[in-house]
Amino acid sequence: MENSATIDLNEANFENEVTKSDKPVIVDFWAEWCGPCKMIAPLLDEIAKEKSGTVKVAKVNVDQNQSLSIKYNIRAIPSLLFFKNGRLRDQITGMTNKKDLIGRLDALA
């Protein structure tokens, strides 16, 4: 599920890539075994390419980064967290569409 336009997050780089970012960040909490996660991944990849330079799109594998999942109270996946200026501003759990994602990003601007 990695793509050159998306950032693979873990406990070591989360703070620098998300909480210290000067750009809005979408963080996708996902797992390899999650069907809906695989369905939403191409939408996030498109957004990462289209909004490159203005928005970061990042992914956290919940199986490999359980402490981040606990910290952000992830109880179902996919869960998309929207950060701006290091603060959590919005959250979606479950499948959504590209228009909704873009609308939520635009609201952060």
Residue ranges and their predicted role:
Residues 1-26, 31-56, 64-79, 84-109:
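Proteins that catalyze or organize thiol-disulfide redox chemistry
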Residues 59:
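Conserved residues in the N-terminal Rossmann fold of short-chain dehydrogenase/reductase
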